[in-house]
Design a protein with these regions (language model features):
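Central cavity-lining transmembrane alpha-helices of secondary-active solute carriers
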Residues: 76-91, 301-314
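Helix-loop-helix hairpin linking two adjacent transmembrane segments in secondary transporters
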Residues: 164-219
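C-terminal ends and interior cores of transmembrane alpha-helices
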Residues: 107-121, 333-348
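Cytoplasmic helix-loop-helix junction between adjacent transmembrane helices
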Residues: 129-167
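Cytoplasmic membrane-interface "Motif A"-like loop-to-helix N-cap segments
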Residues: 95-106, 319-333
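Conserved MFS/SLC helix-loop-helix module at the cytosolic interface between two early adjacent transmembrane helices
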Residues: 84-122
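A late C-terminal transmembrane helix in Major Facilitator Superfamily
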Residues: 382-418
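Extracytoplasmic gate region of multi-pass secondary transporters
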Residues: 54-58, 258-311, 369, 373, ...
Length: 479
């Protein structure tokens, strides 16, 4: 139909309206599609960096503000609830679009990280401002995966969702790298504040990039399933007759099912060990295993770096084989093995040994998560491709729902002080249990177990697409 090599953006109604009217006129192809995906991924990285900026030096903030582990855990719980509310609001992205949510969220996070949080006078102000950061993050947590789904057909979805997960993963990788390079061995609150400022500068730069360049598909195009890029002409033709109001009617009734709600909760149960690594390894490794803060950030760099590579590799493999579920099972098994190794690590364990254990954990989490997210978006499309943001908000809300109870109970299980060996051992057994609970829900997801079955279904679908495209060409020639 058309090759989208320039910025194919509808700009009717004024020279500046393109800053908020972001609909493309055609499905993007080639380098421009890759560029749009890259912008979304970079935005997601910066979002994670701003929200987690202080995590690399959390032990310093506790004495500065007079916070306890219990207060910190409760803060994460409240912030998670706030993010969950934002997820619900952003579910309207099916009608309003997703791109402006990302742009506005970057501006909010940039201003708060650069100015507000570093100047927080007390722990209450710090907690309030952190919750506001999570409010913006909750909206973006829905908007960015929806955009990645929009720009990636199903045959490239595993790789695309692996790249989307770069946001949470690469955000922490950047944070660890900056912290290890910038923070001295004796960390003070003054240099800790700059971790937020660095992320704030990055967020404002990314805000300008997204304001100028980020675009999205019009509702008619994004509300359809597309298995491969060669279907884009057919999708654009069908979009002309699509009734969006009818397609999005009774949206919650359409999207709330076992394989959307229960699987969203189940994957977050699987990720309890991931949430533990994000929020509490900063205590566990330095205080229990006696690593310095610098060594901890070095191990974290390796952990997140391995995760980045693994997400792309596992996502690409699941695309190539056209199956997701076997990877989820393999990743679950590897995660259990890694937790057992971590549980049996003792004080004095070497840097290399701990890096290897966490690399196994990181690889296993990626093996399950990237294919799961690809399968989840395909499951949503099987329900109604016009309600991807609504379905994504279920996942975003489930992330917070699972985080609330676990955030409340972990301080009581690991004990205070944090160096309680029996408490951490109990917690790791709970993490193993949550992985086991996840496994049965793999069977509820959309998709096949055997590559041969998936390949046959795709070939049949391609034959139907070719037939429809041939009919369209004949009708066009006759006209």
């Amino acid at each position: 139909m058309s090759s989208t090599t320039s910025l194919p953006v509808a700009r009717e109604g004024g020279q500046l309206q393109w800053l908020w009217k972001r609909d493309l006129t055609h499905y993007p192809v080639g380098g421009y599609r890759v560029f749009l995906l890259a912008v979304v991924v970079l935005a997601n990285i910066v979002f994670t960096w701003t929200v987690a900026a202080g995590a690399a030096a959390t032990p310093v903030i506790f004495p500065h503000f007079g916070m306890t582990l219990g207060y910190y855990a409760n803060l994460l719980v409240v912030a998670g609830v706030v993010g969950g509310l934002a997820s619900y609001i952003s579910s309207w992205g099916d009608r309003w679009g997703r791109a402006n949510m990302v742009v506005i969220g970057l501006l909010i996070n940039g201003l708060f990280a650069l100015f507000a949080i570093p100047l927080a006078p007390n722990k209450f102000a710090f907690a309030l401002l952190t919750c506001l950061l999570y409010l913006a993050d909750g909206a973006i947590f829905v908007g960015t995966p929806a955009l990645v789904r929009d720009f990636s057909p199903q045959m490239q979805r595993g790789l695309a969702m692996g790249f989307w997960t770069f946001g949470p993963v690469a955000g922490y990788f950047v944070l660890s790298a900056v912290a290890r390079a910038y923070l001295p061995l004796n960390v003070t609150f003054a240099n800790w504040q700059n971790l937020y400022r660095f992320s704030g500068y990055a967020a404002l730069v990314m805000f300008v990039v997204c304001l100028v360049f980020l675009r999205e598909l019009p509702a008619g195009i994004r509300s359809q399933r597309m298995a491969a890029l060669n279907e884009r002409v057919l999708v654009e033709v069908k979009a002309r007759g699509l009734d969006l109001a009818e397609a999005t009617k009774h949206r919650w009734r359409q999207m709330i099912h076992v394989n959307t709600i229960a699987s969203s909760i189940a994957i977050n149960l699987f990720l309890v060990i991931y949430f533990t690594a994000v929020a509490y390894f900063v205590f566990y490794l330095p205080l229990f295993l006696h690593f310095s803060l610098s060594s901890f950030n070095g191990i974290q760099e390796i952990y997140w770096g391995v995760n980045i590579v693994a997400l792309v590799v596992w996502g690409a493999l699941s695309d190539w084989l056209r199956v997701r579920k076997p990877f989820m099972v393999l990743g679950s098994a590897g995660t259990i093995v890694a937790i057992i190794l971590l549980m049996n690590a003792k004080a004095g364990v070497s840097f290399t040994a701990m890096a290897l254990i966490l690399s196994l954990l990181s690889t296993s989490l990626a093996c399950c998560y990237a294919p799961w997210f690809a399968s989840f978006t395909e499951t949503l499309e099987a329900r109604n491709p016009a309600l991807i943001a609504t379905g994504s908000s279920l996942y975003g809300f489930a992330t917070r729902v699972v985080g609330v109870p676990f955030g409340l109970i972990i301080p009581h299980i690991v004990g205070s002080p944090v160096e309680t060996a029996s408490g951490w051992r109990t917690w790791y057994w709970i993490c193993i249990g949550t992985v086991v609970v996840f496994v049965p829900f793999i069977f509820t997801m959309y998709g096949h177990w055997r590559p041969s079955t998936a390949r046959k279904e795709f070939e049949e679908h391609e034959a139907k697409v070719a037939e429809e495209l041939s009919r369209l060409r004949q009708e066009s020639a006759a006209a």
